[in-house]
């Protein structure tokens, strides 16, 4: 009787729990968006599912460990949620209220015209490039004075440009610090 109970109930439940733990550990996980930096597309306190084994391209929304990338962020295990603007080898410029990657104007239909032309808390001026941004003191020394995104790194920005603490401030995001790609908000 006890063996039948183990066989019919305990083993299947244990296997199901093991499968869920493995999927969550290696393939997918859930993260809560914290703050308004991705509005209007992702809201503060909104949950998102991440694909932890995805490849990343321009326009993808990713989650990465804040303390690994932002030198001002020193505690906790909070995550930043940002959009990839540029991938390794890309150049980035902002001029005449437009964003350019590799000399081509970026279609930013995912945000309002007003947000496309917004600056940030710091004034970078009406024109900037990776080279001018990377001369900033908050960027890590190894990333300073780059005119292109280095190998294994990404340049990211929040969709709510006027309030987003993003790559314009802290520099490039290392691929090894990316937790995953947002696949489903809920």
Language-model-derived ranges and their functions:
Residues 1-8:
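Short, Lys/Arg-rich N-terminal segment immediately upstream of the first membrane anchor
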Residues 2, 22, 44-186:
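Soluble "head" domains of membrane/secretory-pathway proteins
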Residues 29-44:
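Alpha-helical transmembrane signal-anchor/signal-peptide segments
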């Amino acid at each position: 009787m006890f063996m039948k109970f183990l066989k019919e109930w305990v083993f299947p439940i244990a296997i199901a729990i093991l499968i869920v733990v493995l999927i969550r550990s290696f393939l997918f996980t859930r993260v809560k968006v914290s703050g308004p930096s991705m509005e209007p597309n992702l809201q503060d306190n909104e949950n998102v599912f991440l694909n932890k084994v995805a490849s990343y391209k321009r326009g993808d929304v990713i989650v990465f460990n804040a303390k690994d990338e932002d030198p001002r962020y020193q505690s906790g295990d909070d995550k930043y949620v940002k959009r990839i603007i540029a991938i390794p080898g890309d150049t980035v410029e902002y001029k005449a209220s437009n964003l350019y990657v590799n000399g081509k104007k970026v279609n930013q239909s995912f945000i309002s015209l007003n947000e496309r032309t917004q600056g940030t808390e710091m004034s970078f001026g009406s024109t900037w490039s990776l080279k001018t941004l990377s001369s900033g003191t908050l960027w890590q020394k190894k990333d300073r004075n780059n005119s292109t995104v280095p190998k294994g790194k990404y340049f990211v920005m929040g969709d709510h440009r006027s309030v987003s603490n993003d790559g314009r401030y802290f520099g490039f995001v290392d691929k090894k610090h990316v937790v995953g790609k947002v696949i489903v908000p809920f």
